[in-house]
Regions:
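Alpha-helical transmembrane segments and their membrane-interface boundaries
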Residues: 1-198
Length: 198
């Protein structure tokens, strides 16, 4: 998702590393039986911290002093974009869909429970992110970020395919059918960008 927000590929990999570590940490905490909402907050906290550390590393003097080939691979012109994308694995898309579906099917009580669950997930996620931003002393980094599509469509197509297949693996989608989701992601993102550009 980071590329879809306008970052470069180096920042995309930084966001992916942070998200993978946060996801694995949350999964491990779930396996040992700790509170699910606390696990979401901890996963969001560590994913955000790691994304911030990688972004700061990419702009540090340590990277600038490396040989040119290494520095060009590690430096990013968009070090803040991973902070926006590293916790998207926690967004409760399925619970939101289930909430709306239950309410529309007149299963009001179940819908309310699922809606409250969704609010708690989002609150835990936001808590982890806010604590990480406070710990790092990050100012309002979004004031200078452009979210307008500016990459070629083929770049967005690749990023959309990777994103769609990545989310599908979270829900144990059959690997042989991932190409279908990749095509769906490509169509959705490129349509969104076409509409945004006018």
């Amino acid at each position: 998702f980071c590329v879809q927000f306008g970052c470069d590929w180096t920042a995309f990999f930084y966001a992916s590393i942070a998200a993978a570590i946060g996801f694995r940490l949350r999964t491990r905490l779930n396996e040992i039986g700790s509170n699910g909402y606390a696990n979401i907050a901890v996963g969001a906290f560590f994913a955000t911290i790691i994304a911030w550390l990688l972004g700061m590393f990419s702009t540090s003097a340590l990277v600038a002093d490396m040989p040119q080939w290494a520095a060009s691979m590690l430096q990013t012109g968009t070090p803040w974009h991973p902070l926006m994308a590293c916790t998207l694995f926690l967004v409760p898309g399925v619970p939101i869909i289930n909430f709306v579906n239950d309410v529309l099917d007149n299963n009001i009580e179940v819908g309310i429970v699922r809606g409250i669950n969704t609010v708690l997930i989002v609150s835990a996620m936001a808590f982890g992110i806010v604590v990480a931003i406070s710990v790092c002393g990050i100012d309002n980094f979004v004031k200078d970020l452009s979210m307008t599509p500016h990459h070629p469509y083929w770049v967005y197509a690749i990023a959309a395919a990777i994103s769609a297949m990545g989310f599908a693996t979270i829900y144990n989608f059959p690997p042989k059918q991932l190409w279908v989701l990749a095509l769906g992601g490509i169509v959705a993102v490129c349509t969104r960008n076409f509409i945004n550009l006018g």
